[in-house]
């Protein structure tokens, strides 16, 4: 009887020690599937704690704030790369034409290069072209100033007082330079009329816009020479017939072999 009581007490003591015992996973030999049953839910309690939640929210806000400038910089860099790519493609498209222009006419090529970097050229192409034309006439005016200062001063005074000079300075300078080279052109007209017409074409734009005004101007310029030289007078008659004679337009050489027609009309 006493042995039964002692054995029951021993069993009760074993059960009590088993329920109150703490299991250490590192030193336990139990399977890993049994260990979580005896561990407290530390992880879930930690994530549900307000301090941990506030810390996580702060970290998320800081990460988003730091990522926004990085995203903006990435977008700006992508936009810059896109613009550079488009500019490179356009430059590659124009490179053959620019290379050909540089070989044929280096001055025009340099003017095209300066036009892209000139604010005046981008804002007002007409004003830029007039400025370039004025620069083309500067060497001739400088030579005139060195050879004949009085004539140069007269040109400057006429340039500031003439309505044509104020409205269109390049055209005015072309007319003035044309008047200066009239003697040489007159000799060329007597010797070779075809070459004379070819020389007149790039200098005077008035013939294309208003042929009547051009003829009047030529008469005013060359009438004194025509009085002194009958050959010049005959040539002027032929020149006046030129815009109205289809045959002379087709063959200027043969038209100058008919001075009787010009003398009969005029």
Curated annotation (Swiss-Prot):
Q: Is the keyword Hydrolase assigned to this protein?
A: no
Transmembrane residues, as ranges? Answer: none
Write down the Pfam families for this protein, in alphabetical order: Zein
Q: Which residues form the signal peptide?
A: 1-21
User: Which InterPro entries does this entry report, sorted A to Z?
Assistant: Maize_Zein_Storage (IPR052508), Zein (IPR002530)
- Give the UniProt keywords, A-Z: Seed storage protein, Signal, Storage protein
Keyword Signal on this protein?
A: yes
Give the GO molecular function terms.
Answer: nutrient reservoir activity
State the protein's purpose.
Zeins are major seed storage proteins.
Spell out the family assignment given in the record's similarity comment: Belongs to the zein family.
Task: Spell out the protein name for this chain.
Answer: 22 kDa alpha-zein 14
Traced from the root, the source organism's taxonomic lineage reads: Eukaryota, Viridiplantae, Streptophyta, Embryophyta, Tracheophyta
